[in-house]
Amino acid sequence: MKKSTKKLVSVLLASAMAAGMLAGCGSGNGKGSTGDSKSSSAASGTSGDNLNADTSEHVDLTMYLIGDRTPDFDEVYAKINEILEEKLNCSLNVEFLSWGEHDTKYSLLFSSQEDFDLIFTASSWCHYEQTVSLGGFAPLSEDFIKTYAPDIWEVVPEMAWEQAKIDGQIYMVPNYANEFGQEVLAVRGDLMEKYGMDDITSWDDLMKFYKACAADGIYASQGGPWYPFFQSQGYSTTGGAPKGGELILYHTQDPEDLEFQYIGEWDAFREYCQEMKDLVDAGAWSSDVLNSSDERQTGLLTGRTASMSWNLGTCLTYGKQANEEHPDWNVTMVDPNKNLSKKVNSYINNGVAINANSKNKERAMMVLNEFYTNPDVYDLAMLGIEGKHWEAVGDDQYKVIDESGYGVASNCNWGWNNCTIQREEYIENRTALDDKYESIKDAFNNNIKEDHVYDGFNFDSSNVSTQFAAVEAAIDNYYNPLINGLVDDVDASIDAMNAAMDSAGIQDILDEMNRQAAEYVAEKEVK
């Protein structure tokens, strides 16, 4: 049975592309001003001054974020709570789901009807579509947003609200920052030099480095580089698809290709899995990686691995930390897909939703308005305490004092990214890593790919919820071992995965996805 959905009629593509996303703030898609943030009403400290909202009764709110609580987190949020108490007569308690546990525990918050109000979410990788299909998030009407978060409504681009819609309803407040979806690597520069490598700019280069590490008795990474691989093939995850979008891909580098690709029937996936088996057999990473509770950065920071794959900003953050603690490692950054044009993430790649069971939805939205548009709250959440963690340089820059207790943008503040008030870092003593980061970022900005209509598509699984749940329940028995090369026989394992997916209903999911995609493309064509 063919798992790749049939190609949609190419005529639907004409005029169907969404407006191009620029790599800077204020690309002309918003309703309000995206100019000088310090002159906006939100930036002037008037956010939250909503005369229509009743704040006479004190409420205690709870928000869930992703990651780990940093040492100074509670101290920082105590400062934020002082502002919230004064302006909104409420307090905010924050709980965390770690990187290692959010895949399993996120949905349990809703199935157990845990009492909380706000939660970080994101398309595909952080459970947005799946939670909406289960009824976990409160729908946010235009009137509700305008009433309780008027400043957010003025700032967030119209395109972002459109991307957040599922079946015509908005269920998250999307972030406003243009981010790149391509993964890069933070890599031990001393080892690259040892192996005679000046840079890693292609998949072949990356495999050469991994093999050199294995031959040298050093783990190259904490697992198989699946994202860099499918990105090297020009593919991207599909919003709302099973396994965080990774089970069904689309050819984002080719706007005329409207065929979804189920990985079990993709020859390149089979070849990748065999290559990963060869690598793990050679010792490129631990054979016990599936049982590890380590965070993604743990291997690099402890010296157990030679690299870490993540986004630009995160690789810079942990690369700097590694270099501060081990200067001789000379951690640098590389783009293993240097010659490919770059995809800009949709705005719903980060966001915040309100729990459908929240007893204080209005106050929760008002709190989010503060996080998103009040510069005092925004700076605290992103940078920490001024004078302890950072200091201001002019009106729109900051200089790091100490990141050990509260790292810059390392505390899941990404859900309310707002580039109209976000400070840029002033780097007094630039390092080679800073320069490499800027070089790669500039290269990304100068090589943005053409839009693909599916870049903004998000699959709604509610019509195939039984099949979707069955696929999600069965896939981990095969998927994680395969992408990390931890199987005895690749072909037999993929065949077994396909049989399990057949039984679970993967074809029903693909058929429904194909139907929705056809409607989505037709709707874009009309617009």
Predicted region positions:
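N-terminal secretory signal peptides that target proteins for export/translocation
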Residues: 1-4
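Extracytoplasmic/secretory soluble proteins
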Residues: 8, 12-13, 20-527
